[in-house]
Swiss-Prot record:
Binds 1 Mg(2+) ion per subunit. HAMAP family: Adenylosucc_synth. Its cofactor is Mg(2+). Its EC number is 6.3.4.4. Plays an important role in the de novo pathway of purine nucleotide biosynthesis. Catalyzes the first committed step in the biosynthesis of AMP from IMP. Homodimer. Gene3D superfamilies: Adenylosuccinate Synthetase, subunit A, domain 1, Adenylosuccinate Synthetase, subunit A, domain 2, Adenylosuccinate Synthetase, subunit A, domain 3. The keyword Nucleotide-binding applies. Pathway: Purine metabolism; AMP biosynthesis via de novo pathway; AMP from IMP: step 1/2. This is Adenylosuccinate synthetase. GO terms for molecular function: adenylosuccinate synthase activity; GTP binding; magnesium ion binding. The gene is purA. Substrate binds at T298, T299, T300, G301, R302, P303, R304.
Length: 432
């Protein structure tokens, strides 16, 4: 039963888009089932760059069924803008299907997100200010509006009226900001709904039918494990579940149907936004990695925080999500930095002097750990590295780096990335 979940095993931005794109070539169905427009994938194909936020990466393969599931919060104008951009690049969108059960992000969600981040000042979470958290709040408060509601004017308008009245009270009385009229939201969003209507389908049936028929089904995770609302560095997290279990919950698929879970682990660590970061680097080392790795947010454009690879974090992700295979991109980036020595965190030294590989639950405990590093010599960059397609063609230094990852996590590294193009990858084990 070839059902594969691809998820980020760090703080997002690991390079999932490349590996989803690679695996999508062998998939008949690609599913995006968590998060919203706050997540971003950049895929290179044929020398052309495609930036994806809400549309599954499989859309670049004609005929591949691409599904946006229940668990996603949709930003309709952003989604339609993305669809129009892809269409202008020659991408066929006829295979896209969207769940009517997906909740909607409205302008008042975005304004509330911005207002709360501004109010917190130095204590801000570092959200993308896309309204994702407030939209999920409405979902779990059972007052949210779903795409299926927007398709029925008589169903939509009373729900929107009640929600606008509630949000206006908060915006005006708590934040001193102007609210919205029902009319300024209703008419454009009803138009968005009509544009999306041809793509709406019963995605639970579509995905489960495909699985039952033995088709290759790929679940495309958004963000990363350490941003999970339950298992991440709370409260510096997203409002959904980027772990493997979240991918199948958001699509309406049972856990027994998953055959492989691929965790994507960047060869170093990056983070956007606030929160603890035990292996964070500053100065020249961080600058070199950031520039060689083009570490600027797909969604925000913000420079990402950079640090050494943290295998305590990755081991934690492997345990929580039952990761069966690791995919490691950016081996080429480390070589290109020219840094003579690389560090890998293999444990945390606690304040009492003990060393552990357990990831702490509390922020205070995490902020007090001292990374225990293993130092390895960097490998020299050469053009041959990006043309390597066999593991033994890699420099010995890179292979030693991979072995250390496997030793600490206990999980095989099955795919390696040696460049930004989709073809620049090494398979050590077939996923599909």
């Amino acid at each position: 039963m070839p059902v594969v979940v691809v998820m980020g095993a760090q703080w997002g931005d690991e390079g999932k888009g490349k590996f989803v794109d690679l695996l999508a070539e062998r998939a008949q169905v690609v599913v995006r089932s968590t998060g919203g427009s706050n997540a971003g994938h950049t895929v290179w194909a044929g020398g052309r760059q495609y930036k994806l936020h809400q549309v599954p990466s499989g859309i670049l393969y004609p005929g591949t069924l691409c599904v946006i599931g229940h668990g996603v919060v949709l930003d309709p104008p952003k989604l339609l803008e993305e669809m129009d951009r892809l269409a202008s690049q020659g991408v066929d969108l006829s295979s896209l299907r969207i769940s009517g059960g997906a909740h909607i992000v409205f302008p008042f969600h975005i304004r509330l997100d911005e207002a709360e981040e501004d109010r917190k000042g130095d204590r801000k979470i570092g959200t993308t200010r896309r309204g994702i958290g407030p939209a999920y709040m409405d979902k779990f408060a059972r007052v949210g509006i779903r795409l299926v509601d927007m398709l029925d004017r008589d169903e939509f308008l009373p729900k929107l009226t009640a929600l606008v009245e509630e949000k206006n009270r908060i915006l005006e009385k708590v934040y001193g900001l102007p609210g919205f009229t029902v009319e300024e939201i209703a008419e454009p969003y009803l138009e968005y709904a009509e544009r999306l209507r041809p793509y709406v389908a019963n995605t639970v049936e579509l995905v489960n039918d495909a699985i039952d028929a033995g088709k290759n089904v790929l679940f495309e995770g958004a963000q990363g494990h350490l941003l999970d609302i339950d298992f991440g560095t709370y409260p510096y997290v997203t409002a959904s579940h980027p772990i493997a279990a979240g991918a199948i919950i958001g699509a309406g698929v049972g856990p027994t149907k998953v055959s492989r879970v691929v965790g994507v682990v960047k060869a170093y660590t990056s983070r956007v936004g606030e929160g603890p970061f035990p292996t964070e680097l500053h100065g020249e080392e961080a600058h070199r990695i950031r520039e060689e790795g083009h570490e600027y947010g797909t969604t925000t454009g913000r420079p990402r925080r950079i640090g050494w690879l943290d295998l305590v974090m990755v081991r934690y992700a492997c345990r929580v999500s039952g990761i069966t295979d690791l995919a490691v991109p950016h081996l080429d980036t480390l070589a290109k930095t020219g840094l003579p020595t690389l560090k890998v965190c293999v444990g945390y030294r606690m304040p009492d002097g003990t060393v552990t590989r357990e990831f702490p639950v509390g922020l205070k405990a995490l902020s007090q750990v001292e990374p225990v590093y293993e130092e390895l010599p960097n490998w020299e960059w050469s053009a041959e590295m990006s043309t390597a397609r066999q593991y033994d063609e890699l420099p010995e230094g890179a292979r030693r780096y991979v072995r250390l990852i496997e030793d600490v996590t206990g999980v095989r590294v099955s795919i390696l990335g040696v460049g930004s193009e989709r073809t620049q990858a090494i398979y050590r084990s077939a996923i599909f």
